[in-house]
Amino acid sequence: MRRIAEKIEYSPTTIYLHFKDKADLLFHLCEETFAKLATNAEELLKDQSDPIQTLRMIGLAYVDFGLKHPNHYRVTFINRPLEHFDPAHHEKSMGRQAFNLLKRSVEQCVNQKKIREIDVDVASQALWAAVHGITSLLITHPNYPWVDADQTINLLVDSMCSGLKA
């Protein structure tokens, strides 16, 4: 907490007025990140015209968010200590809410027969794993000679959506 206080030019005492400890600070930072991801997905879900395109856009928005906010992404998805994960609070968390929006998008695709009958939970986790994987790789390996990040991202998301089609 002292290093954080130094970095933001506050006293450690000031930080403790808002957060009980480092785990609490990290939890709130992660919740804020999940809230932003959820807001992005909610906006995209408003367009009901093409559920596959909406699903695709949610995947692209996820990657875009991570690349534009790599430090938040690292703390939330890469460096976050697992011992702070509390299953009792998971169902109410912003992370669960953000994931449920992805699930809702997959359900819309299934219900409108845009993708084959599939376990929505499995498909949603597979889609999340794919976009998380490419986001994490691009953030943690910036010096790797990526051919063209945008083309790679689009190919991944398009492949995932095409692979689910009926």
Language model segments and positions:
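Short helix-capping/turn signature of helix-turn-helix
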Residues: 19, 78-82, 129
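Helix-turn-helix
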Residues: 1-24, 28
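An amphipathic alpha-helix adjacent to DNA-recognition modules
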Residues: 18-42, 56, 60, 99
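Hydrophobic alpha-helical connector segments
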Residues: 42-71, 124-127
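Hydrophobic/aromatic-rich alpha-helical bundle segments in the mid-to-C-terminal region
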Residues: 74, 85-89, 110-157
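C-terminal alpha-helix
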Residues: 105, 159-163
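Short secondary-structure transition hinges
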Residues: 68-104, 143
